[in-house]
Amino acid sequence: RLPFLFSYLSLKNIVVNLIYRKVKSKDNPFLATMIRNVIEEFDAPRTGTVYEDSSTDHLFELFSKSNSVLWVADLNNEPVGCCGLYPTAGLASNYAELVKFYLSHKARGKGIGKELMIRTMNSAKELNYEYIYLESLPGFSKAISMYKESGFKQLDSPLGNSGHSSCDVWMLKKV
């Protein structure tokens, strides 16, 4: 019985190192790969989405711009999710777009996405945004359900000029 008990206790005491932090330059290749893997996993369009967007390879540089932020979930020193805000061209100055919200398969169903969303919404308040806009794809149905639960309302047409022409789900939330 002792070896079994020891094994059980050892498994129960596994340390998981999960931190939430802002994007770092070293994250660029990991996040770009993760985002493209999610697009492929869900068989989402590659054209007209972040998949072919060159900024996906340079997220640290993109989010170094003022009035933007990209939160990263880091699990055991590996980025497993991200979610950010960006002042997308064509949006009013009191609007930001919720962008680059992706989770690797390792991060799903653990509350990591919800925490990334909370941190991003708190950042929206700190940056004095009044509205958060987002674009998505119908294949991301669980994400869309989470957006609705968080108070996002569906729109009939896009806002701003994200350049992501394949995204045909548009939503808005008052901060």
Which residues does each predicted region cover?
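Residue-level signal for short amphipathic helical patches enriched in basic/charged
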Residues: 26, 127, 135
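Acetyl-CoA-dependent GNAT
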Residues: 18, 22-106, 117-119, 123, ...
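Conserved N-terminal entry element of GNAT/NAT acetyltransferase domains
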Residues: 3-26
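Conserved glycine-rich acetyl-CoA-binding loop
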Residues: 78, 91-92, 104-118, 127, ...
